[in-house]
């Protein structure tokens, strides 16, 4: 009777909802593994699961006075993780057919993300041969019974949702020692817990995710700031979003691709969310791509109107772009205020009270954003991402990294770059963190000073940018940083070592591609290995396609919720080319994306990038990575720039051409370094050409198309 009373009470107060297939809990050997977000998690599971399980409760908790009162509701056994017999007792309970609940994290989350997963829980699952049933508890972290005070807006009676996930099994890992088997079992359970979080991620649009963040973290929470040094709260950002969304309707049609050429600023965030709320699809224009690159982008995405700022064009010396790109209409944000009518103001006021009604009807799977590739191997391609793919990548990042509302991001990478958009804007906004948007990553003295002044805890950038920040920064500038993430290019050992020596900070390297929104893998404090780019994110499937001549590794192909909707190409303007990849049998499979990158997985699942498939030369029958050649040159001449191209060779098939800004670099110095570091002599180029400056794309990457055109031309033309 008491049990029924409390169940009805909780159902009324918290509107508890249970979803999933409860039949998964009816087997003979069941181990239930929920996440742990509040002090009432155990009560919720005891009241609403269709079975009466035994709870494994850590002895430090089970000895508390209040546990005696709960004994009538919850059947529990004390668990001391330091005593092997406690683990064996749990194994026996499972083998006897009692459903057992273990909280693998061992403690209530203090970040809102998954905490450390204890190996013991995984070992119990593997040793007992149990069916593992993950359960996700959502909403209890918003109660006053959680440990997230100050990180979320706590409420007395938030809605609580219990998700019962599909059952799985955790086989006993193969390892010579029991300690290693236990550790591997813990890692396998950690993966199961991460996949469970991804399985219940919200299915919503970008605009709905902004509203959800406002609800979760509070409308008065600061969320974005720029060089005006006036932080915007979620409420203020929403107001700007509604204003922009309303006015954009006058210059565009629903479903239209609209160009956005804007700097890193708070208003840019409002324009993005405002556009998507009203069914417009922002195409993020790379203003560093020049007239030629922008013309390709405009053609591929069939853009008719570009929204920009007079002040931005003035400060960036970009007025030549609207003067030359006359095939589109240019709308300036400064002029929009004059278009606001009384009806617009009333509409904005009404939708501040009912913000969900401001969104036009759309589905998460529909197009939300267009980004453009760098064009390093040809014309820039339009990469169409849906609400689903962008938000899935944000959720993947949140699943493995413990970002909280106490964090402050420094975002200097441009928003037209997928790294800058997803990691630099969407992730902090939707995590409750505050982000400082700075318009240029090239200000190597100013960025460190701002990191110090704004108390930033998260910094990310390319290896080049991070190396320069470290050189110009005071040793105390980065005292608050706890995450330093490198992506978009290979992290140089010199940069890694400089950060370690000067600041005592570990740079975490990641890997991504625009087509994957963009993060594919990343090292995090709980799972990091130098020389790799981390493990593939949860929710993604990965496979390697064999490449002739490469024995260790293969071409990486990916499938997952963060994969793009497809390409827009100059050759077929406006026609969406859905992702598809050829498998090992030669069949084309829809939904798979071929990255074109050659990688290998180590025994623990960490990814090592070996180079682009297109950037391998076949010399005397052997495959040589052009990236390895460039790393060789950097080892000899770390302060200069180097890029490698291929030319035909009558005797060996292909030969290497090294372009360098180091006029003193010789084959002899490269040979000496190669022999010392075990690099094959085939990777040492004979043709070394000096350039005062490498041709670069707007992204800062070498322009390999131009370099390839120079290979067969006389060297003097470009020296």
Curated annotation (Swiss-Prot):
It is a multi-pass membrane protein. In the N-terminal section; belongs to the 2-acyl-GPE acetyltransferase family. Residues 233-646 are annotated as: AMP-binding. This is Bifunctional protein Aas. One of its GO terms (molecular function) is long-chain fatty acid [acyl-carrier-protein] ligase activity. Its main location: membrane. It comes from the Bacteria. It comes from Citrobacter koseri (strain ATCC BAA-895 / CDC 4225-83 / SGSC4696). Its EC number is 2.3.1.40, 6.2.1.20. GO terms for biological process: fatty acid metabolic process; phospholipid biosynthetic process. Residues 15-138 are annotated as: Acyltransferase. The active site is at residue 36. It catalyses: a 2-acyl-sn-glycero-3-phosphoethanolamine + a fatty acyl-[ACP] = a 1,2-diacyl-sn-glycero-3-phosphoethanolamine + holo-[ACP]; a long-chain fatty acid + holo-[ACP] + ATP = a long-chain fatty acyl-[ACP] + AMP + diphosphate. SUPFAM superfamilies: Acetyl-CoA synthetase-like (SSF56801), Glycerol-3-phosphate (1)-acyltransferase (SSF69593). GO terms for cellular component: plasma membrane. It is found in: Cell inner membrane. Plays a role in lysophospholipid acylation. Transfers fatty acids to the 1-position via an enzyme-bound acyl-ACP intermediate in the presence of ATP and magnesium. Its physiological function is to regenerate phosphatidylethanolamine from 2-acyl-glycero-3-phosphoethanolamine (2-acyl-GPE) formed by transacylation reactions or degradation by phospholipase A1. The chain crosses the membrane at residues 258-277, 409-433.
């Amino acid at each position: 009777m008491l049990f029924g009373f409390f169940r009805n009470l909780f159902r009324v107060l918290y509107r508890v909802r249970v979803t999933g297939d409860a039949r998964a809990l009816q087997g003979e050997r069941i181990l239930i593994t929920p996440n742990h977000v509040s002090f009432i998690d155990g009560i919720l599971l005891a009241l609403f699961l269709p079975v009466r399980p035994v709870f494994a409760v850590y002895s430090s908790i089970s000895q508390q006075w209040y546990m005696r009162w709960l004994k009538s509701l919850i059947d529990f056994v004390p668990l001391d993780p330091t005593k092997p017999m406690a683990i064996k007792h749990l194994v026996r309970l499972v083998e006897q057919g009692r459903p057992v609940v273990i909280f693998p994290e061992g403690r209530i989350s203090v970040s809102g993300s998954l905490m450390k997963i204890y190996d013991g829980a995984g070992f119990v699952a593997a040793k007992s041969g149990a069916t593992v049933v993950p359960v996700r508890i959502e909403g209890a972290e918003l109660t006053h019974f959680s440990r997230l005070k100050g990180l979320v807006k706590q409420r007395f009676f938030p809605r609580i949702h219990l998700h019962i996930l599909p059952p799985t099994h955790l086989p006993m890992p193969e390892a010579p020692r029991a300690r290693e088997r236990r550790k591997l079992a813990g890692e396998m359970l950690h993966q199961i817990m991460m996949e469970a979080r991804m399985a219940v991620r919200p299915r919503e649009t970008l605009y709905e995710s902004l509203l959800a963040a406002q609800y979760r973290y509070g409308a008065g929470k600061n969320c974005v700031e720029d060089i005006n040094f006036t932080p915007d709260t979620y409420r203020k950002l929403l107001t700007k979003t509604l204003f922009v969304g309303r006015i954009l309707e006058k210059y565009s049609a629903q479903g239209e691709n609209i160009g956005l050429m804007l700097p890193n600023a708070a208003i840019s965030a409002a324009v993005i969310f405002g556009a998507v709320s009203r069914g417009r699809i922002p195409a993020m224009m790379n203003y560093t791509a020049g007239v030629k690159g922008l013309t390709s982008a405009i053609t591929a995405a069939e853009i008719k109107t570009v929204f920009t700022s007079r002040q931005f064009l003035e400060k960036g010396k970009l007025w030549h772009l609207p003067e030359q790109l006359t095939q589109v209409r240019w709308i300036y944000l400064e002029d929009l205020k004059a278009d606001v009518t009384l009806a617009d103001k009333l509409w904005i006021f009404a939708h501040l009270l009912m913000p969900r009604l401001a969104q036009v009807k759309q589905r998460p799977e529909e197009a939300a954003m267009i980004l453009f590739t760098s064009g390093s191997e040809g014309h820039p391609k339009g990469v169409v991402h849906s609400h689903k793919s962008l938000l899935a990548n944000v959720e993947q990042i949140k699943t493995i990294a413990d970002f909280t509302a106490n964090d402050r991001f420094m975002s200097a990478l441009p928003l037209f770059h997928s790294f800058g958009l997803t990691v630099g804007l969407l992730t902090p906004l939707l995590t409750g963190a505050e982000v400082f948007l700075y318009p240029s990553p090239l200000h190597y003295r100013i960025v460190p000073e701002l990191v110090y002044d704004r108390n930033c805890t998260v910094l990310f950038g390319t290896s080049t940018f991070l190396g320069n920040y470290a050189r110009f920064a005071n040793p105390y500038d980065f005292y608050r940083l706890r995450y330093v993430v490198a992506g978009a290019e290979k992290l140089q050992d010199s940069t890694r070592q400089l950060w370690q020596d000067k600041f005592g900070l570990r740079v975490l390297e990641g890997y991504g591609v625009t087509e994957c929104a963009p993060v594919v893998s990343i090292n995090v404090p709980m799972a990091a290995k130098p020389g790799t780019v981390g493990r593939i994110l949860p929710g993604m499937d990965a496979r390697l396609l064999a490449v002739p001549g490469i024995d260790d590794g293969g071409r990486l192909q990916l499938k997952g919720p963060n994969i793009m909707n497809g390409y827009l190409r100059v050759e077929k303007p406006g026609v969406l080319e859905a992702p598809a990849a050829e498998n090992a049998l030669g069949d084309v499979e829809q939904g798979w994306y071929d990255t074109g990158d050659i990688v290998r997985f180590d025994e623990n699942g960490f990814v090592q990038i070996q180079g682009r498939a297109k950037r391998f030369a076949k010399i005397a029958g052997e495959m040589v990575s052009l990236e390895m050649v460039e790393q060789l040159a950097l080892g000899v001449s770390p302060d200069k720039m180097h890029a490698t191209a291929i030319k035909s060779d009558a005797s060996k098939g292909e030969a290497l051409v090294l372009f360098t800004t180091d006029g003193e670099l010789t084959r002899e110095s490269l040979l000496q370094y190669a022999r010392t570091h075990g690099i094959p002599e085939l990777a040492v180029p004979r043709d070394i050409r000096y350039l005062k400056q490498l041709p670069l794309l707007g992204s800062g990457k070498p322009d390999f198309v131009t370099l390839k055109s120079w290979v067969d031309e006389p060297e003097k033309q470009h020296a």
